[in-house]
Amino acid sequence: MNKLAIQDTYGERFQHCWGCGPKNDDGLHLKSYPAGEACICTFTPDKAYTGGVPQNLFGGMIAMLFDCHGTASAAYFKHRDKGLELTKDTVIGRFITAHLEIDFKKPVPMNSPVTIRATAEEIGERKVVVAMEMEAAEEVCAKAKMVAVAVKDNM
């Protein structure tokens, strides 16, 4: 797995997201890493993010994790598709969510790291379709499909 997080290659203007922005002092600082044909993100939920059912991660947080990891993965997949490598000097093109569909399979426990694996299903000129699975306690808890589009002034 690459040791350089995709989010750490965002341009200065795009580093303030609450979920994944490296420059948001109050944020979660999620990190997505290329790993072969996939991108991986691992997160251990804090008790503050439990939902209406105690000891389970709430759905909005699950959506945010898919959102941040999916757009970072889309940026990487497009970058790689251009034949480029991710380096400390990279300023990667930024993607945003156009559509996010989530299937909640089972509760996500709070006492276990969550791993999200993303793969590219389609890479177009400005659009990347990303498929994701969220695992916790060695079980798939949620699946998502995202359509991410490139921010025009950062490609």
Regions found by a protein language model. Name each.
Residues 1-12, 106-155:
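HotDog/MaoC-like acyl-thioester-processing domains
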